[in-house]
């Protein structure tokens, strides 16, 4: 059936198009600008206003993002400059210290930049980025050891709950070995605080009364810590630690080796709490035929298994010579092997100190080993009763070598960080060497023959 005057129905979702003016060409739409970063070949149409029945192009178009200046790769931000400056101060101090040593002639001279400004100007993007990462590593190493230190930077403990504590004290006569032993206990550098201290000497009669009183006073002082409102807090399970003096011959009695024997004086004390055994002036006795090495390795574990209250076992032995010739039973050799700590007086003979440093610094650069020897030499010329401590099993690598000062306390020497900084100096030296080699090769090619 034919219908007249009806428009065909519009398709669904189809918008009405504006009718173009007769005799007028359809206006070309404005060009569409887009960011060259978008690689879409068929982008979606951009929504715009209806141009109206006149068919004119819209007056507004999508504007291009204004061009940004290219960022230079060799420009450092403020944080990077701060990192490089901080690292440069450390490198400059280490370099000047190494140059001022008496043994600096034996070291390989390292090339370096003349100043910080020269480093920032001529260092190059790659080297400066490496230095930023190296300084971040140094900061991480310092932050790792910070929880183990007090607010003033000193160590809060010598063993940090490591047990058993087997330590050897090396020092000549008059260097303050007895005072050092008392200070270790009175300043609570050995934790936990021992409740019974055994003082072993060749003969009991050779201990002066003044020294006995000093021992009793200082171990009692180390048993307490200051509390709030002027109070004191006991650091162990007793109000007054026991001080027991013994002769060396009583130490080596057979029943003192058996922890199940009721006559064992060490087992009786271990049943109450931690103990400490101090051997002073006993080097000649240790070099005899009677073996006492059980006190250094087997005895601590037996006491701890049988007496749970014995949470701490400390043995400190005094030696006047780092390499005694008389050691028939092997006690001194076994003691050095089992020892966890070596407390060394800088007044020891230089040949013995150099031998010890060469033995226990195999993993350090040669320059840092020479620096450690120079530290020993420097403190040997002073009158302070200071000590340098080597820890075989430190709580952190930075605490492996420490310096004990009567006023400053136990300070870490951070030889691991000094070794890291020396490797950075070597990296700068290699970079400058490579540049010099490339410059010589370039000039050789450009020079007419």
Swiss-Prot record:
Gene Ontology molecular function, alphabetical: ATP binding; DNA binding
Its job: Component of the packaging machinery which encapsidates the viral DNA into preformed capsids and transcriptional activator of the viral major late promoter (MLP). Binds, along with packaging proteins 2 and 3, to the specific packaging sequence on the left end of viral genomic DNA and displays ATPase activity thereby providing the power stroke of the packaging machinery. The activity of packaging protein IVa2 is stimulated by protein 33K which acts as a terminase. May be the protein that pumps DNA into the capsid powered by ATP hydrolysis.
Induction of expression: Expressed in the intermediate phase of the viral replicative cycle.
Intracellular or extracellular location(s): Virion; Host nucleus, Host nucleoplasm; Host nucleus, Host nucleolus
Region (Disordered) location: 1-78
Binding site for ATP: 171-178
SUPFAM superfamilies for this protein: P-loop containing nucleoside triphosphate hydrolases
Major localisation: virion
Organism: Human adenovirus C serotype 5 (HAdV-5)
Protein name: Packaging protein 1
Gene encoding the protein: IVa2
Keywords recorded for this protein, A-Z: Activator, ATP-binding, DNA-binding, Host nucleus, Nucleotide-binding, Phosphoprotein, Transcription, Transcription regulation, Viral genome packaging, Viral release from host cell, Virion
